[in-house]
Amino acid sequence: MKDLLNLLKNQGQVEEFDAIRIGLASPEMIRSWSFGEVKKPETINYRTFKPERDGLFCAKIFGPVKDYECLCGKYKRLKHRGVICEKCGVEVALAKVRRERMAHIELASPVAHIWFLKSLPSRIGLLMDMTLRDIERVLYFESYVVIDPGMTTLEKGQLLNDEQYFEALEEFGDDFDARMGAEAVRELLHAIDLEHEIGRLREEIPQTNSETKIKKLSKRLKLMEAFQGSGNLPEWMVLTVLPVLPPDLRPLVPLDGGRFATSDLNDLYRRVINRNNRLKRLLDLSAPDIIVRNEKRMLQEAVDALLDNGRRGRAITGSNKRPLKSLADMIKGKQGRFRQNLLGKRVDYSGRSVITVGPTLRLHQCGLPKKMALELFKPFIFGKLEMRGLATTIKAAKKMVERELPEVWDVLAEVIREHPVLLNRAPTLHRLGIQAFEPVLIEGKAIQLHPLVCAAYNADFDGDQMAVHVPLTLEAQLEARALMMSTNNILSPANGEPIIVPSQDVVLGLYYMTREAINAKGEGRVFADLQEVDRVFRAGEAALHAKIKVRINETVKDRDGSITKNTRIVDTTVGRALLFQVVPAGLPYDVVNQPMKKKAISKLINQCYRVVGLKETVIFADQLMYTGFAYSTISGVSIGVNDFVIPDEKARIIGTATDEVKEIESQYASGLVTQGEKYNKVIDLWSKANDEVSKAMMANLSKEKVIDRNGDEVEQESFNSMYMMADSGARGSAAQIRQLAGMRGLMAKPDGSIIETPITANFREGLSVLQYFISTHGARKGLADTALKTANSGYLTRRLVDVAQDLVVTEIDCGTEQGLLMTPHIEGGDVVEPLGERVLGRVIARDVFKPGTEDVIVPAGTLVDEQWVEFIELNSIDEVIVRSPINCETRYGICAKCYGRDLARGHQVNIGEAVGVIAAQSIGEPGTQLTMRTFHIGGAASRTSAADSVQVKNGGMVRLHNLKQVVRADGNLVAVSRSGELAIADEFGRERERYKLPYGAVISVKEGEKVEAGAIVAKWDPHTHPIVTELKGTVTFVGMEENITIKRQTDELTGLTNIEVMDVKDRPAAGKEIRPAIKMVDANGKDLYLPGTDVPAQYFLPANALVGVADGAQIGVGDVIARIPQETSKTRDITGGLPRVADLFEARRPKEASILAEVSGTIAFGKETKGKRRLVITPTDGSDPYEELIPKWRHLNVFEGEQVNRGEVISDGPSDPHDILRLLGVSALAKYIVNEIQDVYRLQGVKINDKHIETILRQMLRKVEIAESGDSSFIKGDQMELTQVLVENERLAAEDKFISKYTRVLLGITKASLSTESFISAASFQETTRVLTEAAVTGKRDYLRGLKENVVVGRLIPAGTGLAYHSERKRRRDADKPLRVSASEVEAALTEALNSSGN
């Protein structure tokens, strides 16, 4: 019997579940949850503080107020557990049942649920096929709705106002049924026959032609199918029973002074109960219809306010004029249930304190104040004291700890030994914001932090605070030690470079000790070994910077692991020899034989990690830090005002600039230059002067004169403290020194425009009042920007995490052949990022061949490490196809091969790594460093003259890419395509630079030709757009009549006449319809055709075109027959910084986006409409021509008869990512977005690995739009998950049916987060109400695949160590399947047991 009870007890709480389903609650279900009906609006008796019976806090319904004690006090204590008191009707149980027992209110009249009514799209409206306005008029008793027309002429669902209703009554009597209010709506919903309606809609959709109608019908169809499939009934969207929240979740607390603090919900419930009771009474009294109606409307409004206050009409306010917080408000927003209590909870065993520097700690340690440790580790101490027999009970142990007896400290030290603690600094922007350390007990009250981890935490010691957490369980301690220990986080997950890098004083110390000085003490001596150098230095016989020779023994470990030892004599300095003593064996001496600047140290640590491994690197980093601190102390570097040496040339430079500005001012005064030109010239002048001053200053600071050993005067690098700090990268920059010792330069106004008068003084000289005033602008704007930036950056990170949170590595290899083509990132002739850097840590997708041969040198499936990179560079490969997260075919998650290397560890990524979250953090964390401002093109900042030629920087071979060209008579090539590029490759065939060639560029070199550095290889006129002939023949003018379509202009200087085509607006009536053109004919006057087509060679001329040939002239291939002047592009703002990144990730369509060719073919212009031009592209394959209307003010890059390829730019402007995806495919989109985002970050000097951006892109490309449904159940135009469609298509293909066709869709990150399969994740992100209503109506299941869902339901996340837990749990469950019992089996066992016990 006991086992049976246990079995029954365990039936209630289900531990094992794989999905959560949400649905509509039926009235029966609400009643089944309930423990009784709330009939009175009373809460508690204000004298006795006891809950009123049948009220909102009734103990009979909800349970006792005190543990195991009924209300009247008849039954007390545990022995009466489960007894129901006959006097007060209260069950004797735990008081916490008041947190879980619900009640209900029987509504006297049905009430529509506002979520399904008002949350767009209105579900009730969609089902009933009525507009929201109409339904509201029925619900709020303004109109009648016909429910059953009977034999009358009325229609079902027709609305009648009072007059019409009474007219109908007179006419038809009782033949029809029309009502108002929620009961009418409920009746109509109840009457819907879903099966019949679904069948009708499925027939209707294919017969409809209008797009909007199809959209509407398919929406209804979807909703009806959802209702049918989910087991929800439509009438459940109208409530007849209202559930009541358990009282302890809406507490009422007596304050002193007889007042009460109460949850707003109680007020809202009270209103509902009051109105409901009044309505019941009115109905019993059969009051006049109008009064009842009003009461019903008030009840509807009261319930609306309870469910979602303020959704309809004015929000109901409490006594303090604030809107009351309804049930909907409880769950949404930052303070709502999801974000406040489910996704983030406060934890026990934690403390926080100010941090100070701990320069003596090792990397894995942190200093923990004794007081804090004692408090944090209390339970452990109690346990140890009891175990030792020092205390008999916990109480005694507590007393000992409170008195802080000496033995307590001994026990504490023992407890803390090897028990890691977590340190966290808010804001936690990436995973390195929480790391584990071993605590070291210290006196004082501040936590000590190791200086090298400051960079990861972004911490400094100006009053920052940090929180300490204690991992309690053994597993938690294990994870803290194995995964989160600071020594395991040497590399940054964002870019794979070391993040444990010395900074500031340490860098300065190392730089100081590795500098060399001329004629220092001990110069030229030769030493036998490092120990001897050490001895001599300590004895003071040789200076730190002396140049010496020393014999060293070095151990060099190669990449393949082979170790070579050699002994040699090197030229070095004393300091460098001393530094080499701490370098681990395996690194050559050359790593320290240079001045150690910040970059060099970072490179050294990276190299150390790759060559000798983690443990050695950690020890080395610590040693570097101790050495750096020691020597920066010895150096005695400090700055005084005399270190800022003002250059002598400053006055002269400023004088010259002032004179030139005066000259320009006088030109402006006499009207020779315009205001704009003057402004630009002045600003250019001052920028140049500023640069000159700072050059002079740096030259002055960076060199000093000394006497060498032979007594001659020589120059050496300066030991000026200021210069050393900036040069080493410890603190400060040339720009800051310029403000201190040069001139402050140009300042900006608050609106971002530059003020013409610069600040010529510097901080050493001091600013005048006016100068000071000007410079306050910038400083204030900076502060305002920073505040905005932080909030925006945080929001971007949140959206990124949300979209990528469920992306986890779930398998090793998905087996895809797809990949992205990687080439070096070249911009305007400079290699910004070489190929090696881009493919490092990626897996090769297809075999790489040695250039020009069939030999595979890198097989597919290779994970490219540093060795392979060298190999690829060596073999001068310039393109590689690599696996990418975008192409990964894993259904849930991603595979390790497509992701490649785990950047923070340096090996292939492990299964279970949450790569989505890491990507989001890596992109979001540097967000605060990006700027907020948009840049104006114009002003001194970014003005460049228009390029008109290509000048080669490096010598090499010419390569031409997708360039269509014709050869001119003089042998030069003329480009006749838009997207052509010219590249220069070095002797190994690697591309060093790349240039875009515009249409009409004259190229003076051929493919494969060798050119010298500095040669000009192509030229064009940047101010006009030429029309180039592709064949030779005779020119004939068509429709070119003087003063009707063209006008002749004679140039005064040269006397040459030009023909200019008139604008349509300026032509006389006769010329409006004529389209002037130039036609090419052969010697006999026959039409010539464009090569390879049957299109006659005639070139239509747009307005303002200048014709440079005469009628009947003979011209050759590649000659220019006309030029179209390009108006200088108007200065447009380029969005930079954070807003640009957000725009790209949100996939926003830019204003005036560039227009791309939808199909490949020949361009023609059709009939013009008002204000628009009609562009027609006739495809080469003979399919239907494509037409598009383009506004006339858009400047077109194409003209009649020209061939374009799909996706080529027709009209310039910012690119629209959706167009790129549609026309050029996923790879082109990936390339575009990755490059655009990287440009923003690169400008700020932030390195982020491409794969993080690709990972987010994968999540943005999850959805597809069905183009043809085939034999599938999909509806055309539906958005579906790509994986879902692929699975369905596989199934259809297996059954030899027609598969569905689809196009990829790009969603912005917010949209993608809201359209995930998991409703829990979407609801906890944004628009909670909408997500939940939709999920409830469709009866959605959440399979808890992502991270957020599992956090919300309180399980381990399916990533990292949690992945193992979940797979083990599923395995165990499958093994236990046969042992499961059902409810019916339990019932049978129960009857049997009862029978046997009865006998």
UniProtKB/Swiss-Prot annotation:
<feature type="binding site">
    <location>
        <position position="814"/>
    </location>
    <ligand>
        <name>Zn(2+) 2</name>
    </ligand>
</feature>
<dbReference type="InterPro" id="IPR006592">
    <property type="entry name" value="RNA_pol_N"/>
</dbReference>
<dbReference type="Pfam" id="PF04998">
    <property type="entry name" value="RNA_pol_Rpb1_5"/>
</dbReference>
<feature type="binding site">
    <location>
        <position position="88"/>
    </location>
    <ligand>
        <name>Zn(2+) 1</name>
    </ligand>
</feature>
<feature type="binding site">
    <location>
        <position position="462"/>
    </location>
    <ligand>
        <name>Mg(2+)</name>
    </ligand>
</feature>
<feature type="binding site">
    <location>
        <position position="460"/>
    </location>
    <ligand>
        <name>Mg(2+)</name>
    </ligand>
</feature>
<dbReference type="Pfam" id="PF05000">
    <property type="entry name" value="RNA_pol_Rpb1_4"/>
</dbReference>
<dbReference type="Pfam" id="PF00623">
    <property type="entry name" value="RNA_pol_Rpb1_2"/>
</dbReference>
<dbReference type="InterPro" id="IPR007080">
    <property type="entry name" value="RNA_pol_Rpb1_1"/>
</dbReference>
<dbReference type="InterPro" id="IPR038120">
    <property type="entry name" value="Rpb1_funnel_sf"/>
</dbReference>
<dbReference type="GO" id="GO:0000287">
    <property type="term" value="F:magnesium ion binding"/>
</dbReference>
<keyword id="KW-0240">DNA-directed RNA polymerase</keyword>
<dbReference type="InterPro" id="IPR007081">
    <property type="entry name" value="RNA_pol_Rpb1_5"/>
</dbReference>
<dbReference type="InterPro" id="IPR007066">
    <property type="entry name" value="RNA_pol_Rpb1_3"/>
</dbReference>
<feature type="binding site">
    <location>
        <position position="72"/>
    </location>
    <ligand>
        <name>Zn(2+) 1</name>
    </ligand>
</feature>
<dbReference type="InterPro" id="IPR042102">
    <property type="entry name" value="RNA_pol_Rpb1_3_sf"/>
</dbReference>
<keyword id="KW-0808">Transferase</keyword>
<dbReference type="GO" id="GO:0000428">
    <property type="term" value="C:DNA-directed RNA polymerase complex"/>
</dbReference>
<feature type="binding site">
    <location>
        <position position="898"/>
    </location>
    <ligand>
        <name>Zn(2+) 2</name>
    </ligand>
</feature>
<comment type="function">
    <text>DNA-dependent RNA polymerase catalyzes the transcription of DNA into RNA using the four ribonucleoside triphosphates as substrates.</text>
</comment>
<keyword id="KW-0479">Metal-binding</keyword>
<feature type="binding site">
    <location>
        <position position="85"/>
    </location>
    <ligand>
        <name>Zn(2+) 1</name>
    </ligand>
</feature>
<feature type="binding site">
    <location>
        <position position="888"/>
    </location>
    <ligand>
        <name>Zn(2+) 2</name>
    </ligand>
</feature>
<dbReference type="Pfam" id="PF04983">
    <property type="entry name" value="RNA_pol_Rpb1_3"/>
</dbReference>
<protein>
    <recommendedName>
        <fullName>DNA-directed RNA polymerase subunit beta'</fullName>
        <ecNumber>2.7.7.6</ecNumber>
    </recommendedName>
</protein>
<dbReference type="InterPro" id="IPR007083">
    <property type="entry name" value="RNA_pol_Rpb1_4"/>
</dbReference>
<feature type="binding site">
    <location>
        <position position="464"/>
    </location>
    <ligand>
        <name>Mg(2+)</name>
    </ligand>
</feature>
<dbReference type="GO" id="GO:0003899">
    <property type="term" value="F:DNA-directed RNA polymerase activity"/>
</dbReference>
<dbReference type="InterPro" id="IPR012754">
    <property type="entry name" value="DNA-dir_RpoC_beta_prime_bact"/>
</dbReference>
<dbReference type="InterPro" id="IPR044893">
    <property type="entry name" value="RNA_pol_Rpb1_clamp_domain"/>
</dbReference>
<dbReference type="InterPro" id="IPR045867">
    <property type="entry name" value="DNA-dir_RpoC_beta_prime"/>
</dbReference>
<keyword id="KW-0548">Nucleotidyltransferase</keyword>
<dbReference type="InterPro" id="IPR000722">
    <property type="entry name" value="RNA_pol_asu"/>
</dbReference>
<comment type="similarity">
    <text>Belongs to the RNA polymerase beta' chain family.</text>
</comment>
<dbReference type="GO" id="GO:0008270">
    <property type="term" value="F:zinc ion binding"/>
</dbReference>
<comment type="subunit">
    <text>The RNAP catalytic core consists of 2 alpha, 1 beta, 1 beta' and 1 omega subunit. When a sigma factor is associated with the core the holoenzyme is formed, which can initiate transcription.</text>
</comment>
<feature type="binding site">
    <location>
        <position position="895"/>
    </location>
    <ligand>
        <name>Zn(2+) 2</name>
    </ligand>
</feature>
<feature type="binding site">
    <location>
        <position position="70"/>
    </location>
    <ligand>
        <name>Zn(2+) 1</name>
    </ligand>
</feature>
<keyword id="KW-0804">Transcription</keyword>
<dbReference type="GO" id="GO:0006351">
    <property type="term" value="P:DNA-templated transcription"/>
</dbReference>
<keyword id="KW-0460">Magnesium</keyword>
<dbReference type="GO" id="GO:0003677">
    <property type="term" value="F:DNA binding"/>
</dbReference>
